[in-house]
Amino acid sequence: MEGMDIDLDQELMQKFSCMGTTDKDVLVSEFQRLLGFQLNPAGCAFFLDMTNWNLQAAIGAYYDFESPNINTPSMSFVEDVTIGEGESVPPDTPFTKTWRIQNTGTESWPPGVCLKYVGGDQFGHVNMVMVRSLDPQEISDVSVQMRSPAVPGMYQGQWRMCTATGLFYGDVIWVILSVEEGGLLGVTQQLSSFKTEFNTQPHRSLEGDYNPFASPQKNKQDTNEDHLKDPGGPWEAPLDSIQQDQNGLNHSSVNITPNGLQNNLSVVTYSQGINGPFPFGQS
C-alpha cells in the first residue's frame, strides 16, 4: 500500500510540475536558454512534447540523445569591433555590427558554417550570415547588416555559430542596443565609410598650378598651357637665325630714299657680314 502511495505521489508531482507553466512558448524559450541556444525552437518543442512538457525531463532526454562521439567545432568570441561601439543609434536606422571570432579548436571548421540569429530581438530581416571555414587558432571578423527598432529603448538579441547540419557551437554573441533619438552610431558609421571611400580613390597629381577647387577642365587647360611654355622663360628666336637673316643683307641692297631724292643720296649697300646684335652698328 505504501508503494502505491509513493507511485501516486510521484505521478502527482509529475503532473504538478507539468502544470507549473502552461505557456508552451515560455517552456521552449527556457529550454533553449538552459541549453545555451544549442537547439532551435522546433527541436526544443520536440523534446518537451516527448516528455509531456516537463522541462527537467526534456533536458535529460536531450543529453541522453546526444552522442558523445560528435566532434563539435570550437569558437570563442574575441571582441566587438563595431565602428562606434557603445554609442546609441537613432530609431529605424541601418547600422553594421562586427564581431571578431576565433577557431579555438584543433580542427578546421567544416564548410557551410554560418552565424545565425537564435533569440531575443532581431534587428532587421537578416537572420544569418555565411562564415568561411577557419583553420585552428585563426581569427576573423564577421559583420551583420542590421536596422534599429522604430521605438526608443533597450534591446538585446543572441547570435551563434551553426554548422550546415544545424548544430550550434561556440560562445553566444549578444547584441545589446540602445535606441535613442539623436543617437550617433549611424552618423559615425557613415562618416567612417566616406573616409574609407575617399582614401581608396586614385591620388591626383598636385604638381604645377593645380587647384583642388577648380573644375577638371580648367586644371586640364592650365596643364596643357604649361606644356606649351618654355621652362627657361619667354620664347625667343635663336641667335643663329637672327645672324643668318642679318647676313642675308650681304647679297642685296636696300633702297631707303624716295624716288625724288635718288639723285642726291647714295644707296647704302652692305658688303660685310654683321656680327653684332644691331644691324646698323657698323658703317
From Swiss-Prot:
Gene3D superfamilies: DNA helicase RuvA subunit, C-terminal domain, Immunoglobulins. It is found in: Cytoplasm; Nucleus. InterPro entries: C6orf106_UBA-like, Ig-like_fold, N_BRCA1_central, UBA-like_sf. Residues 219-230 have a biased composition (Basic and acidic residues). One of its GO terms (biological process) is innate immune response. Pfam families: N_BRCA1_IG, UBA_4. Residues 198-254 are annotated as: Disordered. GO terms for cellular component: nucleus; phagophore assembly site. SUPFAM superfamilies: UBA-like. GO terms for molecular function: ubiquitin binding. Coiled coil: none annotated. Keywords: Cytoplasm, Immunity, Innate immunity, Nucleus. The keyword Cytoplasm applies. The keyword Nucleus applies. This is Protein ILRUN.
